[in-house]
Swiss-Prot record:
Intrachain S-S bonds: none
Gene Ontology terms describing biological process: DNA recombination; DNA repair
Protein's UniProt name: Recombination protein RecR
Classification lineage: Bacteria, Bacillati, Bacillota, Bacilli, Lactobacillales
Organism name: Leuconostoc mesenteroides subsp. mesenteroides (strain ATCC 8293 / DSM 20343 / BCRC 11652 / CCM 1803 / JCM 6124 / NCDO 523 / NBRC 100496 / NCIMB 8023 / NCTC 12954 / NRRL B-1118 / 37Y)
CDD domains: TOPRIM_recR
Xref: Pfam families: RecR_C, RecR_HhH, RecR_ZnF, Toprim_4
Keyword line: DNA damage, DNA recombination, DNA repair, Metal-binding, Zinc, Zinc-finger
Family: Belongs to the RecR family.
UniProt-recorded Gene Ontology molecular function terms: DNA binding; zinc ion binding
Chain ranges of the Toprim domain: 82-178
Length: 201
């Protein structure tokens, strides 16, 4: 059976989300149709707001409200200014913040080096990290928190080679994070132990 065009478009929109196949997209579309109009309006406004009222912090690359740049973490002078935790995305920042154990700064790459995907160092938020480190001599350590997969390891090793001549300590998250695992899926205790047991690259 062919669905009316508005439903077909809605289903197609849902299938563009990660992990959503045609069956789940169809269920979501019909669930949306069953919502009252006010909830649908709120939902659509939230989607639009997420795209128009958010930006990336001009210092660290973390996601922030357009009227809060630099982000609240970069503005917080009580944080340890000597340590920068490099992560792949903003979800990783939230995962670390939820541990309440790390009190330094962050730098969000918004990607990883992936030759197979044609993504090089210049395609992610690496140039701004190098510039940031050169402008702030108080930064003494970079903790590399990229995920424990091939792309994450490649990015970590690239960073280590790049920063070693500058005399900045480059460390990597330690035990507890399984190979292939993502930081934002790890529990808080595992993340705390991984940071505490970090090793030099």
């Amino acid at each position: 059976m062919q669905y009316p065009e508005p439903i077909a478009k809605l289903i197609d929109s849902y299938t563009k989300l990660p992990g959503i196949g045609p069956k789940t997209a169809t269920r979501l579309a019909f669930y949306t149709l069953g919502m009252n109009e006010e909830d649908v309006q709120d939902f659509s406004k939230a989607l639009i707001s997420a795209k128009t009222d958010l930006t990336f912090c001009s210092i660290c690359g973390n996601i922030t409200a357009t009227d809060t740049d630099p982000c609240v973490i970069c503005r917080d002078q009580s944080r340890d200014q000597s340590t920068v935790f490099v992560v792949e995305n903003s979800r990783d920042v939230m995962a670390m913040e939820n541990t309440r154990d790390y009190h330094g700064l962050y730098h969000v790459l918004n990607g990883v080096i992936s030759p197979s995907a044609g993504t090089g160092p210049e395609d992610i938020n690496l140039p701004s990290l190098i510039r940031r480190l050169s402008e702030h001599e108080e930064i003494k350590e970079v903790i590399v928190g990229t995920n424990a997969n091939a792309e994450g390891e490649a990015t970590a090793m690239y960073l280590a080679r790049l920063l070693k001549p500058a005399g900045i300590a480059v460390t990597r998250l330690a035990h507890g994070l399984a190979v292939g695992s993502d930081i934002d899926y790890a529990d808080e205790l595992t993340l705390i132990k991984a940071v505490q047991g970090r090793t030099k690259l």
